[in-house]
């Protein structure tokens, strides 16, 4: 851990879905709504929409990146999707999460949110978690940059924070869809949940544990 102290790290960037919370119920609701919406926007049957989406995700890795391959405007898609789902039915505030985020900010480190969701849906998820968007120094969504795994959003994070890649800690739950890009750019990566990965420098069971490890890392 030597040399990774306070003067090195200036930014902690956090993925949202699957990282700040874990909810199978919400994931299932979201996946159903996504297929319904793809079917509506492309004029397809549900079966064909699910097949087309699966084929696109095989190439693009994430739903957001797949939308471009399907010829769907992301901004319209996520605006409509945000009206179809209710995150608060499944996601509840996580005790200790906001406190841990504030402790990291108190170390003089910026906190950012990086999500492939559009801004309206991100606001609903944060509301379900009882976290105000203003807690983050800045938020990058698929409305602001090309979605993960494209490096564009990561570059915007660094530009907004005024720091280099090696001064950023990136936290996410998906190795190939998000941590790989961060790691290849030179960021320090933390994986939340699931199996350990070659693309993660640290692994944590959940977000609170991850933030505890990060605080120690920053103060080391």
Describe each model-derived feature in a short phrase.
Residues 1-12, 98, 102-105, 109-220:
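Asp-based, Mg2+/Mn2+-dependent phosphohydrolase catalytic module
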